[in-house]
Amino acid sequence: MSPCPPQQSRNRVTQLPIPEPGEMELTWQEIMSITELQGLNAPSEPSFEPPAPVPYPGPPPPPSYCPCSIHSEPGFPLPAPPYELPAPTSHVPDPPYSYGSNMTVPVSKPLTLSGLLSDPLPDPLALLDIGLSAGPSKPQEDPESDSGLSLNYSDAESLELEGTEAGRRRSEYVEMYPVEYPYSLMPNSLTHPNYALPPAETPLALEPSSGPVRAKPTARGEAGSRDERRALAMKIPFPTDKIVNLPVDDFNELLARYPLTESQLALVRDIRRRGKNKVAAQNCRKRKLETIVQLERELERLGSERERLLRARGEADRTLEVMRQQLTDLYRDIFQHLRDEAGNSYSPEDYALHQAADGAIFLVPRGTKMEATD
């Protein structure tokens, strides 16, 4: 019997196992159905030379091919140019009958089981030959590669689609990729803090109730209540406020008015001693605060006084400088008006002016005994 169409690769025909004479017809039908499904991979040899796409008006006529044309469907698409063919086969080592779920319909169930056992050897060789010219089809591989990455982000989807067909799995991943990939982890990340908030808030709400700041007033209240409880237990006939706040004479009269045992007297004196110590400590703190306030006021007063004195000193310095300048001008003016017998003016470097006790002014040469004496 003559081989199938010339478009079928020789390696696939030569490497098929030789069937028995009784199963020859079924084997040929199986091969023809596989070649129909491999319409995209059939023209592997013309991919090495620049192809010229020829438009096909319709399916090829029946007499041009052998029994392969009998099983061809009228709506089956024609082979595309070589640069678009290896898109699904460059990185996916699946058999050619798993390219799409719609292409597996013509294969009968008993024939596909035998085809799966007989075709794994020629598929890697054909894929290797076609993968050499799979350069221009890389943009079509992005959806499949990304769909493979999506398995790492959604484990539930991978478990649900594990038993389905390869073509259906690939198409579902492409459809689900833009929706599931960006939002697969966001709901989980938002829900976990919601479950963690209630246990985190409970210790925070309990911390302020047992804080160290509130322990001091409670301790004082406990001390007062403790003295009262001890006084009630010892049956003291007067309240603890009188024990602490009464003066010495009134306190002694109060003790003399009631007959008390030694233990009661010891308790009363202990309560008074601790109460007086507490009052004394409060008064001491009050006096310290008052002293600090007085010192701060005194410092403010001294600071303002210092600023006032500095301003007065500056004004005195300016006034003194003005007086010195005026005295110098007067001294120069006097020497300009003084003349000797010859009518010559006196030089300030050689003569000086001295004032006597009665207010008289004398012109004295510099360096004389009178100047030194004066």
From Swiss-Prot:
Motif residue range(s): PXY motif 2: 79-83
Region (Required for interaction with MAPK8): 1-83
UniProt KW keywords: Activator, Cytoplasm, DNA-binding, Isopeptide bond, Nucleus, Phosphoprotein, Transcription, Transcription regulation, Ubl conjugation
Single GO MF annotation: RNA polymerase II cis-regulatory region sequence-specific DNA binding
Modified residues (Phosphoserine): 158, 171
Record's protein name: Transcription factor NF-E2 45 kDa subunit
Subcellular location: Nucleus; Cytoplasm
Annotated Pro residues bias: 48-61
Family to which the UniProt record says this protein belongs: Belongs to the bZIP family. CNC subfamily.
Gene Ontology cellular-component annotations: cytoplasm; nucleus
UniProt-listed GO biological process terms: regulation of transcription by RNA polymerase II
InterPro entries, alphabetized: bZIP, bZIP_Maf, bZIP_sf, NFE2-like, TF_DNA-bd_sf
Protein's organism: Bos taurus
Species lineage: Eukaryota, Metazoa, Chordata, Craniata, Vertebrata
Region entry Leucine-zipper, spans: 292-299
Protein purpose: Component of the NF-E2 complex essential for regulating erythroid and megakaryocytic maturation and differentiation. Binds to the hypersensitive site 2 (HS2) of the beta-globin control region (LCR). This subunit (NFE2) recognizes the TCAT/C sequence of the AP-1-like core palindrome present in a number of erythroid and megakaryocytic gene promoters. Requires MAFK or other small MAF proteins for binding to the NF-E2 motif. May play a role in all aspects of hemoglobin production from globin and heme synthesis to procurement of iron.
PANTHER family per record: NUCLEAR FACTOR ERYTHROID 2-RELATED FACTOR, TRANSCRIPTION FACTOR NF-E2 45 KDA SUBUNIT
Domains: entry comment: The PXY motifs are required for binding WW domains. PXY1 is required to promote transactivation of beta-globin and for hyperacetylation of histone H3, but not for binding to the HS2 promoter site.
